[in-house]
C-alpha cells in the first residue's frame, strides 16, 4: 500500500526517465522504475536510521541533536527546540558519523581511534565519543548503524542489478519519510547510505504516503491509475536473494569497501585516510 502511495505522490509510474523512490521509516521501502516497469521491495532499515537502537538515540523531537559539525576538535551541534541536548536523532547520527570519518576519528570500518581526541573515552568496556555535554555515542552504536546503512544501500544496489540499470541512468532519487526530509545529502553520501550522484537528483519529498493519499482524495481519476500500477509492480523478496548478505557485507564500510563508487568522498579524504583503502 505504501509503495503505491509513493508512486502516486511523485508520478513515478508515468515518467519516461527511470527513478528510484526510497521511503525510510520503520522499514525501508523501495521502488525503482518508470512508466514501463516498477520493481519494489522492503526491508528492515529504519530503526537505527531513526535513532531507535543507539544508547542516546531518540526521535526528531525537542531536545534531539539533529545536526553535528566538528570544528578544530570541538563538536558544534543544533538541538531541536533550542533546548538542552537530551539525545541524538537519525539526521544527527549521520552527520556525526560523517564528521568522525572525514576527520579521521574513525576508520573505514567505523572503529574509533582514542588517540585522535580526549573526547573519545573508554566507557562500559568500549570506546565512545562525547558529542554533547553528558552524551556519548558508543562503538556498538556505530557498528549497528553501519550494518543498517549497509542493508539500505544493498537494497538499492540489488534492485538496480536485477533490472540491469546503472546509477548513471537514474534521473531522480527520491527520499521519503521524516528521516529523508531532514538528513544532509552530503553526510548521507559520505557514510555510504546514498549513492554518490548528482546532488540535484537527490530529492527529499517528506511524507509521501500522506501526500499520495491527499492527491487521491482530490483527484478521483487517480483510482483509475492504481490498477495499472499494480500490474506493473514486481515484488522482490530480499530474504530470498542468495547473495544479498554477501553484497551487504561489502557495504559495511564507510562509505563502501569499493571506494571507487564514491569519487566525491575520495576527493575529500586527507592523504593519511586514503592510505587505509
Residues covered by each model-derived region:
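Gly/charged contiguous loops adjacent to phosphate- or pyrophosphate-bearing nucleotide/cofactor binding elements
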Residues: 94-148
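Glycine-rich phosphate-binding loop of actin/hexokinase-like ATP-binding domains
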Residues: 13-92, 184-206
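Short, small-residue-biased leader/transition segments that mark boundaries at the very start
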Residues: 3-8
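Phosphate/ATP-binding catalytic cores across multiple sugar-kinase/actin-like superfamilies
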Residues: 146-168
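Generic secondary-structure signature for well-ordered alpha-helical cores
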Residues: 12-15, 36, 70-73, 82, ...
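A glycine-rich phosphate-binding loop feature that marks nucleotide/adenosyl-phosphate handling sites
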Residues: 26, 113-121, 169-179, 229-240
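Acidic, glycine/GT-rich loop-and beta-edge segments that sit at the periphery of enzyme/chaperone cores
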Residues: 1-2, 215-277
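Catalytic phosphate/nucleotide-handling subdomain of diverse soluble enzymes
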Residues: 34-36, 53, 165-229
Amino acid at each position: 500500500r505504501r509503495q503505491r502511495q509513493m508512486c502516486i505522490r511523485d508520478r513515478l509510474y508515468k515518467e519516461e526517465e527511470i527513478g528510484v523512490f526510497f521511503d525510510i521509516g520503520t522499514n525501508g521501502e523501495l521502488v525503482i522504475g518508470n512508466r514501463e516497469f516498477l520493481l519494489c521491495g522492503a526491508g528492515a532499515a529504519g530503526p537505527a536510521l531513526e535513532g531507535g537502537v543507539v544508547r542516546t538515540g531518540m526521535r526528531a523531537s525537542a531536545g534531539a541533536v539533529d545536526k553535528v559539525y566538528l570544528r578544530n576538535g570541538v563538536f558544534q551541534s543544533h538541538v531541536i527546540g533550542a533546548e538542552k541536548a537530551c539525545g541524538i536523532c537519525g539526521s544527527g547520527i549521520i552527520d556525526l558519523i560523517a564528521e568522525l570519518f572525514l576527520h579521521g576519528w574513525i576508520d573505514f570500518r567505523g572503529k574509533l581511534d582514542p588517540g585522535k581526541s580526549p573526547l573519545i573515552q573508554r566507557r562500559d568496556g568500549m570506546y565512545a565519543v562525547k558529542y554533547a555535554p553528558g552524551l556519548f555515542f558508543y562503538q556498538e552504536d556505530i557498528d549497528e548503524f553501519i550494518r543498517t546503512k549497509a542493508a539500505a544501500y544493498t537494497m538499492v544496489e540489488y534492485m538496480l542489478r536485477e533490472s540491469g540499470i546503472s546509477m548513471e541512468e537514474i534521473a531522480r532519487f527520491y527520499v521519503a519519510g521524516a528521516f529523508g526530509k531532514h538528513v544532509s545529502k552530503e553526510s548521507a553520501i559520505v557514510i555510504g547510505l546514498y549513492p554518490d550522484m548528482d546532488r540535484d537528483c537527490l530529492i527529499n519529498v517528506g511524507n509521501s504516503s500522506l501526500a499520495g493519499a491527499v492527491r487521491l482524495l482530490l483527484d478521483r481519476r487517480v483510482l483509475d491509475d492504481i490498477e495499472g500500477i499494480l500490474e506493473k509492480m514486481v515484488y522482490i523478496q530480499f530474504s530470498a536473494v542468495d547473495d544479498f548478505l554477501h553484497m551487504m557485507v561489502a557495504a559495511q564500510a564507510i562509505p563502501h569497501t569499493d571506494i571507487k563508487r564514491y569519487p566525491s568522498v575520495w576527493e575529500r579524504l586527507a592523504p593519511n585516510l586514503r592510505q587505509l583503502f
